[in-house]
Curated annotation (Swiss-Prot):
InterPro entries: Class_I_gatase-like, FGAR-AT_N, FGAR-AT_PurM_N-like, PurL_large, PurL_linker, PurM-like_C_dom, PurM-like_C_sf, PurM-like_N_sf. GO terms for cellular component: cytoplasm; Golgi apparatus; vacuolar membrane. Its EC number is 6.3.5.3. The lineage of its organism: Eukaryota, Fungi, Dikarya, Ascomycota, Taphrinomycotina. Pfam families: AIRS_C (PF02769), FGAR-AT_linker (PF18072), FGAR-AT_N (PF18076), FGAR-AT_PurM_N-like (PF22689), GATase_5 (PF13507). Disulfide bonds: none annotated. Mg(2+) binds at residues 692, 733, 737, 903. Keywords: ATP-binding, Cytoplasm, Glutamine amidotransferase, Ligase, Magnesium, Metal-binding, Nucleotide-binding, Purine biosynthesis. It is found in: Cytoplasm. One of its GO terms (molecular function) is metal ion binding. GO terms for biological process: 'de novo' IMP biosynthetic process; negative regulation of TORC1 signaling; purine nucleotide biosynthetic process. The gene is ade3. It comes from Schizosaccharomyces pombe (strain 972 / ATCC 24843) (Fission yeast). Transmembrane segments: none annotated. This is Phosphoribosylformylglycinamidine synthase. ATP binds at residues 312-323, 391-393, 691, 905.
Length: 1323
């Protein structure tokens, strides 16, 4: 094993954070990476020879005097995602002697002299993640990192229950195994297993293996089998006719139309719109008209996120993406969402008056840590895989609530909710799994087995604190999204064939292949014979049980016909995606797993034992009535007499995380990848995160103006008062959000219902039944909508001992509703952005009150902010009123009367109107005379309703439409938008102002929570600058200042008789190929799919192309530096290097475009690009965070005229999207910078909204020197840029464009010109 130290592992910000967290025990620290390179025994590799891939290697030792050395490295027995990718790079780059590379961090720590043992332990805990890392005071030994132990053998569990053995003793032994392995088996299931091993002829002659028992525990866990939802219920002594699941299925039974597949697969499939399949056919990107069906799914990953937030949330999103990719014969995730519920944040120095700190179990993360780390984990997976995340929610809650006996208990989210969901697309002919032919090869596709995620299905089925700490840690997985992207590329290659070779596919999730492989063949009515050692596995010491049951991520199981196996293998090899043919299906319905290494049979079971009918669960529940107090809407009971009640309420409500800006959760995510996003969370010229709905475009294709919408709704605090009302309001809120998009009709909406509960907690089982009944048997059938998909998590409580006292926190019943619908007009997506008087004339604000004057405050944000629950909560009281409102809204979408729309929800009418003003940077004046005389109740109740902005000239028509639908009494003309720059927000009654402030002040308060989180997590200076920008009333926002007419095609006057070939170049991990291919395809090129394996193998030569386009994404997961692995694989491969050298240097008819990861590639290939020696490298953003934003770019007037891409765009400035973590332009030397400026290679740069070159964040999102965003070669034929023009080629894909351009620009926006210009140059 070679050991070398590397560069600094601590940024200024991260060092500061650690010192702040360890202030009581540490006075100083520094850190560098250290690399452990495991090589073949006779290898001659050394520091110098490894530097091309590990550029920061140092031969000297890192051990400063007077410090204590602390070494952090991946947990023994595990392989980090970093190691997998780094080793992959080394092998691709020709380092055949490298077996594995691992990386750790060496800290040199100066501890304070008086540090106690407890302080030392606390300080060390801040240096590593116990779930994924180990800590030592010396460098790890080779055997500790590079496990060379012999494989562990099979274990048999001695039940002694066969041949007339004692069943009671066997039951006791199995109970012991149940606790030891964390199987979460119920007593009746233990009895069932004992009976099976007693009476089943093929089993009673032997003892069960640990593999069999562990598999049974996973397959039959609550997580996988949903026992509570399938149980028989008796409530208050009355036996119920329906199971919970039967009530949910009732919605589909009553309304099956428009749903293609429900309850039978990893996601539900819905009828979509007409569109196209745009995909490579024999390598050529081609477009084919066909229906585009879409699918929906929402998962939760609560337990892992509580234990270790980053990997827990990352694998939550990753698992849900796999669900969407493994429907029928194969599918594809298209856009995602993420939601979080946690207890109070308790931000240091920013504690809010409603917050509680009741402690937590030692090994569970705090709510603050969860919200600092989990969203990064989820976003990182989405970003790297290449799925835009365009919707979500965030709620905090922790409160003392009375029990039925009047004593108090804590209700909150110590067991957090981490929701991950989304929509995908599927070809109609692939919506159902095909029958698997007997004898078909069964394949595991994706990453290898790893010693992670053991028992996750069972662990998540237990209330937190019931299992052991070590079992909790063992049950959490780790994510490798770049591997999952490779697997998805294999699936895509199969599904775009005329005849898909995949017969059936399942994702590997809870229980690992022990659940997925049996399920795959069982669904087909078959058995199977598997060989354990054919399952890809890179940790040799793993036992049979660990290989079979581990939840290693990024895996799928599938079947193909024998005659298609070679084709499938060739696809995998092209994509460098691991796979294993692990067995074959059999007619006999028996599951057999052999182990040729030990010549054993770890599993030999009839399928009916595994999937048979263990005893059905029966649940008995009692209704619990708790004493409730009416909320004092005057607030006098909660405030000092001198307080201003409305001002106090405003400031509390705007700071509540459920209301406050979610910017810190949004800009960390890529919301533009694919180029098919028509509506993300950020709204308008000032990009304020207030959108109600996320919308995707159906597909690329001429004239396509349709899409798919998704939105969420949840009202969990109300469930503490009325579970039925909470459920109805969650459905209603979701629909109110969804109709901001133009949906065809109410009956096209389909829902996912995700149920979180602690049904064993007093009263909670009855509440769960009440809520399911309210929407399953009553509301949804009445609305004509259904719930064809969903999930449940039935262990939402946390228990622990602290100082000898037992503590517990139990979540309220939490129903998360996600709605999905086709969209029939992408140009009629309403946002909350109020339009300015100067742009459209005088307007009115109309409030539609669907509660007909009721103003119940129970369960509201206002009540929570005063630590109150209330006694009466909002409800959907009048179904006809609600349906008529939706009918009016769908009709209004066919007009141009509505200028802005926002539903009323968390925070009430005050928040609805304020957010609309924030988004529009306008002032508003509102009058409450037509509402209840209780001002606070009128402003902060959360009854159903919405606000619309209507031009005064259109008011009569809009009011007439509401009247025609019986809604006249619901409509209130309550305000107007003010002209000018004053931007005041005021509310009055009877001519007297009851509240007045400024947009900038309220906007600042609303953004404060996000700012505080960014200040802790990211570069605090960047967070401060973004906060300060809010106060600028004169900020004109994003704008289009064009020197060209987008309607005029620069190729129109050319006689284009051919489509020259452009290589759409990608490497493993690249995810931005679709939008790049379309941009060139739409501009008159033949776009050709070229993987680096095509070039390295010699199958493809660049001589055949006039252009290359290196796409964005995460080649090799950005390990060893963004673009570095990709570039090094070219530079160190003689044939590939020559291919690129010839393309760049020996031909004058070529051009090249590198975007994002492709830009980073070009900058590292600058030695091959003529005149590019002075180009900068692109490194970590100054914000220390991934940045997904819409920003302003300017094309330099002089330099722009010298580039073939921008000659007709020179001098223009316009918005574009950025999506990168490493985009800051840094020069190798000052002389390079001077040469670069002298030659005028600075082509594109960031400007602020005043059209000025800027270093200020977030206008310059990465801190690039001179705001550099894109560079050109001296000849003008090669362009490298970090922003993504290809993602906003479609006009509707721009997060903001002027309303006046909706019809003027046609299908494409201004950035199509960049690609058309290349086509013009080719001629």
């Amino acid at each position: 094993m070679l050991v070398y130290y590397g560069g600094s592992a601590l940024s200024v910000q991260s060092k500061k954070k650690i010192l702040e967290l360890t202030v009581s025990g540490v006075s100083d620290l520094n850190a560098v990476y250290f690399y452990l390179i495991y090589t073949k025994s006779n290898s001659s590799l050394n520091c110098e020879s490894l530097r091309p891939i590990l550029s920061d290697l140092q031969e000297s030792e890192f051990k400063p005097d007077g410090t204590t050395m602390v070494y952090v490295f991946p947990r023994p027995g595990t392989i980090s995602p970093w190691s997998s990718k780094a080793t992959n790079i080394a092998n691709v780059c020709g380092y055949k002697d490298v077996i594995r590379i691992e990386r750790g961090i060496a800290y040199s720590v100066v501890f304070k002299d008086d540090i106690s043992e407890e302080m030392l332990k606390s300080a060390l805990n801040h240096l590593y993640d116990r779930m994924t890392e180990a800590l030592r005071f010396k460098l790890p030994e080779e055997d500790e990192v590079f496990d060379k132990h012999e494989p562990a053998p099979l274990v048999r569990i001695e039940l002694n229950c066969g041949q007339g053995g004692d069943k009671q003793a066997a039951t006791e032994r199995l109970n012991h195994a149940n606790k030891k392995f964390g199987l979460a088996l119920a007593p009746d299931e233990i009895d069932y297993l004992v009976e099976c091993y007693t009476s089943e002829p093929s089993l009673k002659s032997r003892e069960p293996t640990d593999v069999e028992l562990f598999m049974f525990g996973q397959v039959n866990s609550e997580h996988c089998r949903h026992k509570i939802f399938n149980a028989d219920w008796t409530i208050d002594g009355e036996k119920k006719d329906y199971s919970l699941f039967k009530m949910i299925r009732n919605t589909h039974l009553k309304n099956p139309q428009y749903t293609i597949s429900a309850y039978s697969d990893n996601a539900a499939v819905f009828e979509g719109n007409s569109g196209t399949l745009f995909a490579p056919v024999n390598g050529i990107w081609s477009m084919k008209d066909e229906p585009v069906e879409f699918l929906g799914k929402v998962e939760t990953h609560n337990h892992p996120t509580a234990v270790s937030p980053f990997p827990g949330a990352a694998t939550g999103s990753g698992g849900e993406i796999r669900d969407e990719g493994a429907v029928g014969q194969g599918s594809l995730s298209k856009a995602g969402l993420a939601g979080y519920s946690v207890s109070d944040l308790n931000i240091p120095g920013y504690k809010q008056p409603w917050e509680l700190d009741v402690g937590k179990p030692y090994h569970i993360a705090t709510s603050l840590d969860i919200m600092l780390e989990a969203p990064i984990g989820s976003s990182a997976f989405n970003n790297e895989f290449g799925r835009p995340c365009i919707n979500g929610y965030f709620r905090t809650f922790c409160m003392e609530v009375p029990r039925g006996d009047g004593t108090l208990e804590i209700r909150g989210y110590h067991k957090p909710i981490m929701a991950a969901g989304g929509i995908g697309r599927i070809r109609k002919q692939h919506a159902f799994k095909k029958s698997i032919a007997p004898g078909s090869p069964i394949i595991v596709l994706g990453g290898p087995a790893l010693l992670v995620g053991l028992g996750g299905g069972a662990a998540s089925s237990m209330n937190a604190g019931e299992g052991s700490e070590e079992l909790d840690f063992a049950s959490v997985q780790r994510g490798n999204p770049e591997m999952q992207r490779r697997a998805q590329m294999v699936i895509d290659a199969c599904t775009t064939m005329d005849e898909n070779i995949i017969q059936s596919i399942h994702d590997v999730g809870a229980g690992g292949v022990s659940n997925a492989l049996p399920e795959l063949v069982h669904d087909a009515g078959l058995g199977a014979r598997f060989e354990l050692r054919d399952i890809p596995c890179i940790e040799p010491s793993m036992s049979p049980m660990q290989i079979w049951c581990c939840e290693s991520q990024e895996r799928y199981v599938l079947s193909v016909k024998s005659e298609d196996l070679d084709t499938f293998k060739s696809i995998c090899e092209r994509e460098r995606c691991p796979y294993g043919v692990v067995g074959y299906s059999t007619v006999e319905q028996r599951l057999i797993l052999t182990d040729r290494l030990y010549n054993t049979t770890p599993i030999d079971l009839p399928m009916e034992v595994l999937f048979g009918k263990p005893p059905k669960m029966s649940r008995v529940a009692e209704t619990q009535t708790i004493p409730l107090s009416k909320f004092d809407s005057s607030l006098k009971s909660y405030l000092a007499p001198s307080s201003d009640p409305i001002l106090d309420a405003v400031e509390r409500v705007l700071r509540m995380p459920a209301v406050a800006s979610k910017s810190f959760l949004i800009t960390i995510g890529d919301r533009s990848v694919t180029g098919l996003i028509a509506r993300d969370q950020m709204v308008g010229p000032w990009q304020v995160p207030v959108a109600d709905v996320g919308v995707t475009v159906t597909s690329y294709g001429k004239g396509i103006n349709t899409g798919e919408a998704l939105a969420m709704g949840e009202k969990p605090i109300s469930a503490l008062v009325s579970a039925a009302a909470s459920a109805r309001m969650a459905v209603a809120e979701c629909i109110m959000n969804l109709v901001a998009a133009s949906i065809p009709a109410l009956d096209r909406i389909r829902l996912s219902a995700n149920w979180m509960a602690a049904p064993s907690h007093p009263g909670e089982g009855a509440k769960l039944y009440e809520a399911v009944q309210a929407i399953g048997l009553e509301l949804c059938p009445s609305l004509g909508i259904s719930i064809p998909v969903g999930k449940d998590s039935m262990s939402m409580s946390m228990k622990w001992n602290e100082d000898g006292r037992e503590k517990s926190v139990t979540a309220p019943l939490s129903l998360i509703i996600t709605g999905f619908s086709p969209v029939d007009d992408l140009y009629s997506i309403w946002t909350p952005q109020l339009r300015k008087v100067e742009d459209i004339g005088s307007t009115s604000l109309i409030f539609i009150d669907l509660a007909n004057g009721k103003q119940r405050l129970g369960g509201s944000i206002l009540a929570q902010s005063y630590k109150q629950l209330g006694d009466e909560v909002p409800d959907l009281d009048n179904l006809d009123t609600f349906k008529n409102f939706i009918n009016v809204i769908t009709q209004l979408h066919k007009t141009n009367y509505i200028q802005a729309y926002h539903d009323k929800s968390d925070g009430g009418l005050f928040v609805t109107l304020s957010e609309m003003a924030f988004a529009g940077h306008v002032g508003i004046e509102c009058e409450l005379d037509s509402l209840s005389s209780d001002n606070i109740a009128a402003l902060f109740n959360e009854e159903l309703g919405a606000v619309i902005q209507v031009c005064d000239r259109d008011i009569a028509k809009v009011l007439e439409l509401f009247a025609a639908n019986g809604l006249s009494t619901c409509v209130h003309r309550i305000g107007k938008v003010l002209s000018g720059q004053a931007q005041t927000i005021s509310f009055s009654r009877s001519g007297k102002i009851i509240f007045k402030s400024t947009r900038s002040k309220l906007h600042g308060i609303w953004h404060e929570t996000s700012y505080k989180m960014q200040e802790i997590r990211d570069n605090p200076e960047c967070a401060r600058q973004e906060m300060e920008n809010i106060a600028d009333n004169n900020d004109p926002g994003l704008g289009y200042h064009l020197t060209f007419d987008p309607n005029v095609s620069v190729t129109a006057d050319l006689a284009l008789t051919s489509r020259p070939k452009v290589a759409i170049l990608r490497e493993q991990g690249v995810n931005g190929y679709l939008e790049m291919a379309y941009a060139f395809y739409a501009s008159g090129f033949t776009a050709v799919d070229v993987h680096m394996t095509d070039i390295l193998s010699g199958r493809v030569h660049l001589d055949d192309f006039v252009g290359i386009a290196a796409c964005g994404g995460f080649s090799y997961g950005d390990v060893l530096g963004s673009g570095n692995g990709w570039a090094t694989s070219i530079l160190l491969h003689e044939d590939a290097r020559n291919e690129f050298y010839r393309f760049f240097n020996e031909r004058k008819d070529t051009f090249g475009l590198g975007i994002c990861n492709g830009c980073q590639l070009f900058s590292r290939l600058k030695s091959l690009i003529p005149g590019a020696k002075s180009w900068p490298m692109f490194t970590f953003n100054e914000s220390a965070q991934y940045e997904g934003r819409a920003v302003m770019l300017k094309i330099d007037e002089t330099s722009g005229s010298k580039s073939i891409f921008t000659e007709s765009m020179a001098g223009s400035s316009l918005p574009v999207v950025v999506a990168h973590g490493e985009g800051r332009a840094v020069f190798d030397s000052e002389s390079d910078y001077e040469q670069f400026k002298k030659e005028g290679l600075d082509l594109i740069y960031y400007v602020n909204n005043y059209n000025e070159r800027t270093s200020r964040y977030p206008f310059n999102p990465n801190g690039s020197r001179d705001a550099i965003a894109g560079v050109r070669s001296p000849c003008g034929r090669f362009l490298a840029m970090m922003p993504h023009p290809e993602r906003v080629v479609l006009k509707v894909a721009n997060s903001y464009y002027p309303h006046s351009k909706a019809s003027e620009w046609g299908v494409h926006g201004p950035w199509i010109r960049l690609f058309q210009s290349a086509r013009k140059w080719v001629g």
